[in-house]
Amino acid sequence: TPRSATTTRIAPSGSKSDVAIVGAGPGGLASAMLLAASGVKVTVYEAAPVIGGRTSRITLEVERGRAFHFDRGPTFFLMPYVLEEIFAAAGKRLQDYADLTRLDPMYRLLLGRPGKDPLVVDTTQDIERMGAQLDAIERGAGAQFRKFIADNRVKLDRMTPLLRRPIRKFTDLIAKDAMKCAPILAPHKSVHDLLGKYFDDPLVKIALTFQSKYLGMSPMECPSLFTILPFIEYEYGIWHPRGGCNALMRAMADACEEMGVTIRTGAPVERISFAGQRATGVVVDGETIAHEHVVVNADAAWAMKNLIPESLRRSQDSDANLDAKRYSCSTYML
């Protein structure tokens, strides 16, 4: 299982550090929870008038006391144990702040066929039932689906230590646990290529590769590493948070505020202040606010160009190099 070795509560460090966090999206709020649990003074600055970042929501009031809420970003939730670990580390329980429902079926796929009605697949964590639906499309696909799940269980298990720590230098990539991943990553193959190892029917491949679009990528271009995405759905399920995914942001914000975190919405950070190469605070509405440390939870390229002076960046992070890069879009779905 990719769960971490421990979910014990973070012990207060006794530190009197003062930390600014740029952005009240899920990463910023998670950072705030963990830092506050260790005893650090935390202030979160969010440019928008509401929390959530790309997991914010739109509210349409229809009459007094009644309104409709629409998630602006994700609409379903994966791997809830990760958020459970964050809450546990802060000495709290996710179930005290949010209500999650496991979906079964997870979603319905309509697989189009020229001149025919689409094939309907109701995806489920019941591997035998899911395999039977795939067998109806391609003989033997059920057994291959079970092999696909087993292989990706090994892949994610080996990759988890790597995914849970920063890669700061080349030697991090040749550490023992990183090298254990090398034989199973197949970096020269795409998600679509790797599915060809298991299935022949293009509709079965579509059913298990469209998840790469969550990353804004085509299955034909997406690195084969990301076959873990459909595996994660079938292994851990798809969940609906009552109130939408933004309700999870509210849950995290509530936990933060209980621990003394200050969350300032409508407070766009214009730039980070520096003394030499050390961040010393943030500039908001023309005011420089001192902090000992700054955590940035914003798009990396945007933050580099807008928050950090070019003179302090590495050459590969110059404005010209950042402008020359290709960036994937997110997925727009109705």
Language model regions located:
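N-terminal mitochondrial targeting presequences
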Residues: 1-12
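N-terminal glycine-rich phosphate/pyrophosphate-binding loop and immediately adjacent elements
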Residues: 12-158
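Rossmann-like flavin
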Residues: 112-223
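Short beta-strand to alpha-helix junction loop
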Residues: 179-193, 234-254, 264-266
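Glycine-rich loop(s) and the adjacent beta-strand/alpha-helix scaffold that form part
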Residues: 238-251, 255-259, 272-273, 287-334
